[in-house]
């Protein structure tokens, strides 16, 4: 697929380093099949994964996977080729169902949760299939889709700036609009997850790092050997997005994610066999660590964690016990280490592991009742 991308620039080579213009875009559309619009829409909506306009899924509401699926269906002949090339990936839903059968027989099946688990895997395959069809099989020019991707992320950053202004300038009608637009809003004071933070168009502020370092950064690395201008544009987008998010105090995770990404970049970009580069790399690593420490001091939540441990921040501690419950559930039924509890049955793992997780947290000097209370709360919510 990477080799295909090198050759996929025959149509829109004109003025590709200049600003995006309507003429190259229209030329691109006229030289491609009509169904390419579904691909372009899916790419444009990649930064939009937390609005009420998307399809509901646990912890996010994406739009792009459905559009990628439509593009795949429009190109079903090529989809068969893509499925053969990436057969192991396309067998994931089948493997998931087969492995889930023992858990379903033992613990029952939660139909809605199982459906969302399996459709989540189908969304992954739709995304993989659409990208393979477009850039590996059809080999469409990649510059126009990349322009759209960069523009859409700049737009989402602009939305975050407007959200931040609406919060700090107390523009309640605007803040209220965004609060209603987002499926789980972090905008105003009524948020049960902690308001007063811009979330751009993401499901949570903590998703910022996932987009920057899970989508844009790999693309930047791919572009380095193909087009330095686009690599630079992606780099500038990542840097501005990360710094802007930190300055606007959008979340704690972006501080940690940025430091980790910086450390990785320093390690990759230095030749550690060369003495001069080794000295420079060590200095850069020390500088990155200092930036991380400054980030901890500047962020109240990170400072609280550093001072009081895991329980210093409620959100951070919740991630610990909410993860520990199902992990301990594997210990309650060791055979589930091989098969799991079945797709959609993570709640059964939570119930089975809550007591053990509570004891473990108590032994570590933390509040073990939180792990038990989480499982009890879910039981009450489901009416058990």
Residue ranges of model-derived segments:
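N-terminal hydrophobic segments of proteins, predominantly signal-anchor/transmembrane helices
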Residues: 34-51, 65-130
């Amino acid at each position: 697929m990477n080799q295909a991308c090198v050759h996929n620039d025959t149509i829109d080579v004109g003025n590709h380093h200049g600003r995006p213009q309507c003429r190259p875009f229209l030329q691109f559309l006229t030289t491609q099949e009509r169904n390419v619009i579904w691909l372009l829409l899916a790419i444009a909506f990649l930064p939009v994964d937390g609005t009420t306009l998307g399809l509901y899924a646990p912890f996010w509401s994406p739009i792009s996977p459905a559009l990628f699926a439509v593009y795949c269906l429009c190109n079903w002949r090529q989809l068969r080729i893509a499925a053969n090339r990436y057969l192991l990936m396309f067998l994931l839903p089948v493997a998931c169902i087969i492995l889930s059968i023992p858990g379903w027989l033992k613990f029952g099946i939660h139909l809605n949760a199982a459906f969302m688990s399996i459709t989540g895997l189908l969304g992954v395959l739709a995304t993989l299939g659409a990208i393979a069809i477009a850039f590996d099989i059809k080999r469409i020019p990649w510059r126009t889709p990349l322009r759209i991707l960069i523009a859409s992320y700049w737009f989402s950053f602009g939305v975050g700036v407007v959200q931040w202004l609406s919060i700090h300038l107390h523009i309640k009608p605007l803040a209220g609009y965004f609060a209603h637009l987002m499926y789980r809003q972090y905008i105003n004071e009524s948020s049960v997850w902690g308001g007063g933070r811009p979330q751009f168009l993401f499901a949570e502020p903590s998703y910022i790092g996932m987009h920057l370092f899970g989508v844009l950064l790999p693309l930047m690395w791919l572009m380095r050997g193909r087009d330095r201008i686009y690599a630079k544009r992606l780099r500038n987008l990542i840097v501005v997005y990360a710094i802007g998010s930190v300055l606007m105090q959008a979340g704690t995770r972006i501080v940690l994610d940025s430091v980790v990404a910086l450390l990785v970049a320093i390690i990759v970009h230095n030749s550690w066999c060369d003495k001069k580069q080794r000295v420079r790399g060590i200095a850069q690593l020390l500088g990155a660590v200092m930036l991380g420490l400054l980030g901890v001091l500047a962020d109240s939540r990170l400072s609280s964690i550093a001072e009081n441990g895991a329980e210093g921040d409620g959100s951070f501690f919740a991630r610990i016990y909410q993860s520990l419950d199902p992990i301990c559930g594997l210990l309650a039924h060791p055979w589930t280490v091989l098969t799991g509890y079945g797709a959609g049955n993570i709640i059964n793992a939570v119930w089975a592991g809550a007591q053990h997780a509570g004891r473990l947290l108590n032994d570590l000097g933390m509040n073990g009742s939180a792990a038990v209370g989480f499982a009890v709360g879910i039981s009450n919510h489901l009416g058990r």
